[in-house]
């Protein structure tokens, strides 16, 4: 299966790609899982929401209990997937260090109320200090100073005047 990621990234400036992945679906083979790892590495996702399969009554998969993947195999695969996902997410986030991002303020951080939290237009979580409290919904420009797999750190540059027009970005689904 050829990758559409390079073409999509070439067509849309500053595109962020994310996905949801379930590990351990009934009947999943080692080959299936290996291919999942290859696709995740190839598509270079900015983020991936990863889950361990759990049976849901009333679904077709719930009737496939005879094909359940052993829990120890699922746990090992999930750990391997997390390594690939974290590596690509950190690399993509580190590439943003030094950039100035527009951030919509969501409020104070749960861990440190002196730090504000907000999101970029790519839905990247950003933690940054502000000399004064900012209201939820305020837009600020923030220079990215550091990166982790699930969020960015930054410093406040300026407040952004309320926008009179925002461009809607089309969302494609596979």
Kindly give the residue locations of the regions a language model identified:
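Conserved C-terminal portion of the radical SAM core fold
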Residues: 1-59, 80-89
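Terminal RNA-binding accessory module
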Residues: 61-174
């Amino acid at each position: 299966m050829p990758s559409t990621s390079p073409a999509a990234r070439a067509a849309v400036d500053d595109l962020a790609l994310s996905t949801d992945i379930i590990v351990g679906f009934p009947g999943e083979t080692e080959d299936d899982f290996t291919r999942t790892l290859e696709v995740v590495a190839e598509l270079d996702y900015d983020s991936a929401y990863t889950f361990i399969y759990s049976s849901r009554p009333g679904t077709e998969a719930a009737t496939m209990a005879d094909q359940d993947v052993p829990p120890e195999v699922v746990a090992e695969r999930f750990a391997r997937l997390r390594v690939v996902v974290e590596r690509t997410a950190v690399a993509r986030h580190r590439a943003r260090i030094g950039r100035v991002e527009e951030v919509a303020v969501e409020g104070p951080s749960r861990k440190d109320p002196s730090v504000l939290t907000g999101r970029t237009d790519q839905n990247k979580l950003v933690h940054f200090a502000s000399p004064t409290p900012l209201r939820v919904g305020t837009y600020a420009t923030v220079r990215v100073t550091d990166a982790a797999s699930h969020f960015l750190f930054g410093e406040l540059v300026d407040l952004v005047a309320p926008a009179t027009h925002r461009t809607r970005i089309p969302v494609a689904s596979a």
